[in-house]
Amino acid sequence: MASKLSIDHEAIPVTALNCSFRKKLGLFLNPTNTVAADWRTVAELMDFTYLEIKNFEKRDCPFEKVLTDWETRPDATVANLLSILEKAERKDVISELKEILDDDCRKYMERQQRKPLQVPVVDSCGPRTQEREGITLYDDPQGLTPETFDAFICYCQSDIQFVHEMIKQLEHTEYNLKLCVFDRDVLPGTCVWTIASELIEKRCKRMVVVISDDYLDSDACDFQTKFALSLCPGARTKRLIPVVYKSMKRPFPSILRFLTICDYSKPCTQVWFWTRLAKALSLP
């Protein structure tokens, strides 16, 4: 059945490409090549900066990281990946891996065509398992009226003081917003990854990402950010809002570079900071 499907590469995200394709693509592009373009040329064509590329160089398999970061962008389609490889004059790679690539694309299309199994008594918009019932401080233990929030706050522990200031400015003022702060609102004893995905997707209208140097080293923040981006490719719903509250020594995360940020690190913009952030979180 899969072989009969015609492929529109423009409509298929790069996330559809499986591990075997990624590994083989890396085998072509990772080695430094004095004759053909390597991963650095491809990264430049993907619009990564010089500093980002220098950071990628520190990895054993740099192209895997390049592809992982690029695939969160709104233009990360299979068609654009093929176009970039052509611009890099690596048609040899396309020719060698085209069969594997198309096979992954067909499998993705098959999965998209399958109708999800729906049980009549289950509301797909609400919690679906016991693990997702009674997860926050003011949840209904039976899961009938789950607690909802205006925004999920993605932060690392070293930035908790700024989160306290955010609570003060957005919850205890005329803005009267309701924030989901993991350390304050989530009950202990639950799976961190499952609960975070439930809150971000089902319970919170938006997500605020507190960006700092320490954020870049946080596995939890990395998961939460990429999960939120996967829910709104291209930021069409203004779902994710990056916030910078102090100057950074390390490069701003490339996967968030296409989003408008709220910057508290510059004294000249602080006067507008809370009003802008509150307005963004108050949108329908």
Swiss-Prot record:
UniProt keywords, alphabetically: Cytoplasm, Immunity, Inflammatory response, Innate immunity
Domain spans labelled TIR: 147-281
SUPFAM superfamilies found in the cross-reference section: DEATH domain, Toll/Interleukin receptor TIR domain
Domain of life where this protein originates: Eukaryota
Protein name (Swiss-Prot/TrEMBL): Myeloid differentiation primary response protein MyD88
Description of its domains: The intermediate domain (ID) is required for the phosphorylation and activation of IRAK.
Region entry Intermediate domain, spans: 102-143
Known role: Adapter protein involved in the Toll-like receptor and Il-1 receptor signaling pathway in the innate immune response.
Gene name linked to the record: myd88
Annotated organism of origin: Danio rerio
Residue span, Death domain: 24-101
InterPro entries: DEATH-like_dom_sf, Death_dom, MyD88_Death, Myelin_different_resp_MyD88, TIR_dom, Toll_tir_struct_dom_sf
GO CC terms in record: cytoplasm; plasma membrane
Listed GO MF terms: TIR domain binding; Toll-like receptor binding
Pfam family, one: Death
Primary location class: cytoplasm
One GO BP annotation of this record: regulation of neutrophil migration
Subcellular location(s) per record: Cytoplasm
